[in-house]
Amino acid sequence: MARRTPSQLNMLLAVDKPVGCTSHDVVSQCRRALHERRVGHAGTLDPMASGVMVVGVGQATRLLGMLTLDTKSYVADISFGVETNTDDAEGEAVRTVPVAPELRDLAYAREQLAAMLGPQMQVPPAFSAISVNGVRAYKSAREGNAVDLPPRPVEVYAADLIAVGGEGDTCVWTVAFSVSKGTYIRALARDLGRACDSAAHISALRRTASGVVSIGACHAVEELSAESAAGFALDPIAALGATRVDLPGNLADDLLCGRCIPVERALADFDTAKAPFALVLDGGLKALARIEGGRFVMEHVFPQAIGGVR
């Protein structure tokens, strides 16, 4: 079996996903733009959503599972009066309720949003990528089958009202959310509508941050190329929240072989209490490690250094 050719690009990138395409579409576009096959992403966005999408290229794809634990931030338009089978504007209406006057009251809106804060059990939307007996929930839902998803623990850290709009039979709350991993904003809108004795769905959604990566760090896929990518690379150590440790270049073979390295070989002082430790050689991220018995013990070794370290 032929061995995979090492990636020429190894980095994290922040892409501003446009409305109308899937997360997989963005990955495919990045593969073509960068001429790299090994590309993945951290955290799916629905086709109708836009915003922050962290993409891993080459060795950096191995970091993606560590990034999905991060807090996510969104700005959402929540439209009242209609609940849909997908909990967003792309679905079919399943329940319609006249818009009550109090929904336009700012104090009432803030009170209802405040009640959403904190840990809670959330039932995901039926149209979601969660697997049920090996089948994606959205596939079963599209076939007309009843989808019964168990509630999952999530947490809403912030739900700040930005505006109340809409005219006539419509009322729209624009809300800035900060939530834990696995929280569905569509489900929050659905549950908010019910809590207000109404019906609601998401009519627009934009992810504004994923962990420490904000929308200001993002670039359109059209801006990316194999030549320009290095200038757009995210600092992988900052994205992971790791502690940087610089090591001398003559330890490259030891790192590549996964050998333990004495802590005193570090080129500068660092906080030994703040794991994980990002081991840097010649300006590139070569490994992630923990400390045991005064030595760095390798947890992840990257044969090709991950770029973007600042």
Task: Go through each PLM region and give its residues.
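RNA pseudouridine synthases
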Residues: 2-187, 191-217, 288-289
